[in-house]
């Protein structure tokens, strides 16, 4: 097993555990939150990439998959950055220092960024793709209003 596969399996498990704890503790209504949706997007995408790796070869060289992963990375990075800047300072300490909080707001977002920077092929993106990647966050923003 390659290091990238092992890393993605660990990261997918972190996302799955974090989302599972949130849903267990706070109910199915958590599925309406951007944090949970973006973490589900991450772990389901990572599971797909892992299966792709086993069946067809290295997913990190497939430019279509990397472009999709760029969008997933942008979506989860928004989760991490917005939480850290806007919400973490006002979160009560007993809610901040929990496993689920660190999994969904820090470990999975920054873990996927590291995965992208370390394992993915370089220069796989086109200049206009960040515009496409912003569709998921903007759609959620419209939904939230």
What residue ranges belong to the model's regions?
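Aromatic-rich, lipid-facing transmembrane alpha helices and their immediate juxtamembrane interface loops
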Residues: 1-145
